[in-house]
Amino acid sequence: MTNIHNDKILILDFGAQYTQLIARRIRELGVYCEIWAWDHNPAEIAGFGAKGIILSGGPESTTLPGAPAAPQEVFDSGLPIFGICYGMQTLAAQLGGATEAADQREFGHAEVNVINPDALFKGLSDHGGEPKLNVWMSHGDHVSVAPPGFTITATTDRIPVAAMANEEKRWYGVQFHPEVTHTLQGQALLRRFVVDVCGCQTLWTAANIIDDQIARVREQVGDDEVILGLSGGVDSSVVAALLHKAIGEKLTCVFVDTGLLRWQEGDQVMAMFAEHMGVKVVRVNAADRYFAALEGVSDPEAKRKIIGNLFVEIFDEESNKLKNAKWLAQGTIYPDVIESAGSKTGKAHVIKSHHNVGGLPEHMKLGLVEPLRELFKDEVRRLGVELGLPRTMVYRHPFPGPGLGVRILGEVKREYAELLAKADAIFIDELRKADLYDKTSQAFAVFLPVKSVGVVGDARAYEWVIALRAVETIDFMTAHWAHLPYEFLGTVSNRIINELRGVSRVVYDISGKPPATIEWE
């Protein structure tokens, strides 16, 4: 079988907000890559076996003492190097060029003039054949003097060195960000570096990844049994489908129905996995335990803790019944791995971790199976489709681990959860009907623990309030509220109030992030 990790790129992270985006773009080209902190062990960098190295952007300044720098082993490797933004600045500073602080930061669209087309730029244009490109800038410093052996390949009206190249050594640098979509020829530039200059084969495809992981899982677990906590979310669902294909009936999934899931989600999970795919799923109906444990609790963090601890407790009980299980499968994905690796100096970018299963009891002496640990979320979704999971499941909006427990403000009660699940289902149903679901990044309903006066028939009613929330975002770090049509919102409001007894008012949240968070709790 072809080794899909043979041709790979190493990205050294200098703390840029876009570093993961660089990796995702390279993976989209069909080439495997990894992100390591810039201060990673130099011997491991030298021994990684990359076909090329990318130096990412970053928030530091090369004009200050102690600025992060690429290890000498990078330059000694003889490999092609591509410096992006700060990555180009440290290339210049380390190789005998000069950088300086700009009078003011440059952030946004810019026009680059290609004056000496190199292997990356040759023939590219956004202006009808003229050697000009529309790019995205985000920098304070810039290269003022290119290092010896380098040619200035592009400039702008504001900076003398927008790109540079040493074609003999195959070292390149650009001041702009090819990884963002605002740089129209960005993916073409990355392809030229990764495929043309570095010579990488495009082996990183969904079908190849599935074959590779099936072989790895079979080698890892042998004839042992594996247990998986199935939540109905994308990651655990893809793990379930992948492991079922790899080891069949040796996989047992435990699905804990907390009573805090989306409308009829428990039945949908069982229909999909147990009935349609033949996966062995143990369904634990634990709603009574959850509502009893949450009684009288209104603090959001306390609710999260109770919900998380109870899941671990129930999962532990069920795993003890499976005497032959030697392995625990988890839906850990690549951003979790980057977070745990960290940086020795603390100057590299740290991403908040969202582990699927955390805090499992120490006495659970199970080995870990993590078939998604090399993948980004978009890759996990593509794998899910390739494995035959419905697109509607694979491309569902994010759902919080504690479920409706953090979308019911204040104390959680069974009747609140049922009302909210139905209201949420109506909202999502109408979004799909209006072809707006995929145009929003996340949409959901929130139960507000306040009553509002309304008129139902000829009588006054004093009933609950439902808030609707819909946002558009690229990375979930910042978000804009979705400008849904008024007529659409009116339709959703009418359905919720007419179909749900106990709701008299529906409001729409028009807060951005920041200052508000996407979830209410």
Curated annotation (Swiss-Prot):
Q: Which PROSITE patterns does the annotation name?
A: GATASE_TYPE_1 (PS51273), GMPS_ATP_PPASE (PS51553)
Q: Which GO terms describe its cellular component?
A: cytosol
- Please name the InterPro entries in this protein's record: Class_I_gatase-like, GATASE, GMP_synth_C, GMP_synth_GATase, GMP_synthase, GMPS_ATP_PPase_dom, NAD/GMP_synthase, Rossmann-like_a/b/a_fold
The GMPS ATP-PPase domain sits at 204-396
EC numbers listed for it are: 6.3.5.2
Write out the catalytic residues in the record.
C85, H177, E179
Keyword annotations for this protein, in alphabetical order, are: ATP-binding, Glutamine amidotransferase, GMP biosynthesis, Ligase, Nucleotide-binding, Purine biosynthesis
Residues annotated for ATP binding in this entry: S231, G232, G233, V234, D235, S236, S237
**This protein's superkingdom?**
Bacteria
Tell me the Gene3D superfamilies matching this sequence. 3.30.300.10, 3.40.50.880, HUPs
All copies of domain Glutamine amidotransferase type-1, residue ranges: 8-203
- Which PANTHER family does the entry mention? GMP SYNTHASE [GLUTAMINE-HYDROLYZING] (PTHR11922:SF2), GMP SYNTHASE-RELATED (PTHR11922)
Provide the assembly information: Homodimer.
What is the recorded name of this protein?
GMP synthase [glutamine-hydrolyzing]
> Source species, please?
Stenotrophomonas maltophilia (strain K279a)
Ranked from the top, the taxonomy reads: Bacteria, Pseudomonadati, Pseudomonadota, Gammaproteobacteria, Lysobacterales
